[in-house]
Curated annotation (Swiss-Prot):
The gene is tsf. Residues 81-84 are annotated as: Involved in Mg(2+) ion dislocation from EF-Tu. It is found in: Cytoplasm. GO terms for molecular function: translation elongation factor activity. This is Elongation factor Ts. Keywords: Cytoplasm, Elongation factor, Protein biosynthesis. Pfam families: EF_TS (PF00889). GO terms for cellular component: cytoplasm.
């Protein structure tokens, strides 16, 4: 059946979900408004965007240590109330995000944080490669757009596939947690530490070591 713009807008007002999510929900449920609301709630999409505008100043600084103490992560995740900060689901979310950062090594939380100069350099590389193919300019721009989105998905935490469920992104997991807990949650910042990173290891002279051991 055909889904009208009015149906999509009505569902969006009721749930706060995105337009494309609302359209998909209505399509999947045959245009039934109530079933579409339930569909979005099950997906963790209903009301998350409405809550996202509220200020979150409480929360936790979570940590994760991996590989015998050779990799460590600190992440700050904010919520609206101290009550939620003590919630087991919230604490599990913080732990999951710290673990994800350790495994996926993002550089930024969100795409808005990417240095514009870095982005422009990437675009220039993509544009040069795409033009070598001899494709029309409009196709080249679409190729560049796709490459930029892949670039964001590689380096931005919220756009990365979630390590415990690659069928969804970290953003989707965040939306699901917001919907389940009923409060705005925000991943503010993180830091990853790898033992010895940036240090130059002293290269040993094996022959000299043998000679020294032999007293030569």
């Amino acid at each position: 059946m055909s889904i009208t713009a009015a149906q999509v807008n009505e569902l969006r007002k009721a749930t706060g979900a995105g337009l494309m999510d609302c359209k998909k929900a209505l399509t999947e449920t045959g245009g039934d408004h109530e079933q579409a609301v339930d569909y979005l709630r099950k997906k963790g999409l209903a009301a998350a965007s409405k809550k996202s505008g509220r200020v979150a100043t409480e929360g936790l600084v979570g940590s994760y240590i991996h590989a015998g103490g050779k990799i460590g992560v600190l992440v700050e995740v904010n919520c609206e109330t101290d009550f939620v900060a003590k919630n087991e689901n919230f604490q599990a979310f913080v732990k999951d995000i710290a673990m994800h950062i350790a495994a996926a090594s993002p550089l930024y939380v969100r795409r808005e944080e990417v240095d514009p100069d870095v982005l422009e350099r990437e675009k220039a590389i993509y544009r040069a490669k795409a033009k070598e193919s001899g494709k029309p300019d409009n196709i080249v721009e679409k190729i560049i757009e796709g490459q930029v989105n892949k670039f964001y998905a590689d380096i931005c935490l919220l756009e990365q596939p979630f390590v415990k469920d690659s069928d969804k992104t970290v953003q989707t997991y965040l939306n699901e947690t917001i919907a389940a807990i009923g409060e705005n949650i925000s991943i503010r910042r993180f830091a990853k530490f790898t033992l010895g990173e940036g240090l130059a290891k002293k290269e040993s002279d094996f022959a000299a070591e043998v000679a020294a051991a032999a007293g030569v």
